[in-house]
Amino acid sequence: MTEQQPVAVLGGGSFGTAVANLLAENGVPVRQWMRDPAQAEAMRVNRENPRYLKGIRLHDGVEPVNDLLATLQASELIFVALPSSALRSVLAPHAELLRGKALVSLTKGIEAQSFKLMSQILEEIAPEARIGVLSGPNLAREIAEHALTATVVASEHEDLCQQVQAVLHGRTFRVYASADRFGVELGGALKNVYAIIAGMAVALGMGENTKSMLITRALAEMTRFAVSQGANPMTFLGLAGVGDLIVTCSSPKSRNYQVGYALGQGQSLEEAVSRLGEVAEGVNTLKVLKTKAQQVQVYMPLVAGLHAILFEGRTLNQVIEHLMRAEPKTDVDFISISGFN
């Protein structure tokens, strides 16, 4: 990557815009592609993303564009911040242009029909590309406002991790590296489900003990499932696991938390998602995760409970009663029951 070669950011949402700004602040020329030409033009003229990141000035080094072909041709390092439902359809027609390039997924979601993570879809589309993921406790607005933040870039290609660290690491944004791409990406995708539960709990006035129980049991469920899929359990003790889970389950800025809060106030799922105006990946992830957990026989009572409320007509009180009656098992599943080797 030469000094003047632009880095591409695909997606016009809040996180893509925040990352584009970070890159530009580090002196990297950025082309931010979005599907909507009107949005691209408005961002070029007004130097702001009013739809998704209102009040944050778009750095002069970010060029909003609508020509995907030219963007892919011009860039060797490409950050992909597309919704999970759109990633395959947007990039598959341009597979040849991705050959040999560095693709870093920013999307925390799972493809519904295949239960594939975004990096796995990128591998299918561009098997000769180097693939990585970026995930962690990263609320887009706080990043854009320069709150002190840390994230994890994960890839089996160490040089890709170093490349991402070189362009993104800055005075308010620390980038750590990991080789556990699958674990880091699963942490980012799974925690969205539990953020919905946390938002509901706050709206219903549940106590601090309850919220703490939900977050820690959520971490146990996430880790249990991820280990069944081949991830390293220790990854979930870091930024991409417990770090991301805490911020997403605690902050009203989290989209999935907002959906849960609205549900707890008595809104329907359709109303809660519609009012949000952005994609809440947790709703889609919940559906496929419930099915997958049953297939691989992984015990995930919080996932099953939320699914019962949103899609099976159960009430919250019914689900809580069922959860509290369930047999208590081990606290941490990947160590022996006694805690000793």
UniProtKB/Swiss-Prot annotation:
GO terms for biological process: carbohydrate metabolic process; glycerol-3-phosphate biosynthetic process; glycerol-3-phosphate catabolic process; glycerophospholipid biosynthetic process. The keyword Cytoplasm applies. Its EC number is 1.1.1.94. It catalyses: sn-glycerol 3-phosphate + NAD(+) = dihydroxyacetone phosphate + NADH + H(+); sn-glycerol 3-phosphate + NADP(+) = dihydroxyacetone phosphate + NADPH + H(+). NADPH binds at residues 14-15, 35, 108, 140, 255, 279, 281. Sn-glycerol 3-phosphate binds at residues 108, 136, 191, 244, 254-256. GO terms for cellular component: cytosol. Its main location: cytoplasm. GO terms for molecular function: glycerol-3-phosphate dehydrogenase [NAD(P)+] activity; NAD binding. The active site is at 191 (proton acceptor). This is Glycerol-3-phosphate dehydrogenase [NAD(P)+]. The lineage of its organism: Bacteria, Pseudomonadati, Pseudomonadota, Gammaproteobacteria, Pseudomonadales. The gene is gpsA.
